[in-house]
Amino acid sequence: MQVTLNNSFTVKQPIAKVWSLLSDPRQVATCMPGAEILEALDDKTFRGAVKLKLGPFSAQFKGEVVIERMDAKTHEIRMVGKGKDAAGTGNATMTISGKLTEEPGGGTRMESQSDLVISGKIAQFGARMIEDVSKSMFGKFTEALTARLEGRAPSAEAGAISVTEVAGAVVKGAVGRLFGKGEKDEGGA
């Protein structure tokens, strides 16, 4: 199953500060619920893990993230992560492309596209649920990133994505689609 997500958000921080954080995978991982960097293999390749818990189903994907492109001049980055569920029940590949632009007044806007390809048990949840959960995760990521940029402790939990978060994301997504709001930018600050 393949899911493509387009997200954007704006923070009231200078582009150089935002780029400094987003170009460091170790710092990015601290803002992602359930994610951690286990080891740097070189300056562009990292071994990591992501924990998910969807109701009775839980998974821990372990794999590698490779920075394919990082341009400090244009503030563009492209990363590819590939992982396997530790229990052998699935695989995931995610390609993330992001670009930062300066906003009037000194803020920074980030636009990203994520292409996620999953197989195995987790794919049984369907594209809509995976999309809704991914949007919820992106929201938590932007909250944690903003907190870190402002010098506050991120509120994103280090643990796995929980069934409560999944249910909330699914209900929010379904209600939004029902009333025609499901396709709008939900990551803005």
Ranges and model annotations:
Residues A40-G83, A189:
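Glycine-rich portal/gate segments that line the openings of hydrophobic small-molecule binding cavities
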Residues Q2-S8, T45-R47, Q60-K62, E76, ...:
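Intrinsic-disorder/low-complexity, polar/charged segments enriched in Ser/Thr/Lys/Arg/Asp/Glu/Gln
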Residues R69, K82-V133:
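Beta-strand/loop substructures that line and gate deep hydrophobic ligand-binding cavities in soluble
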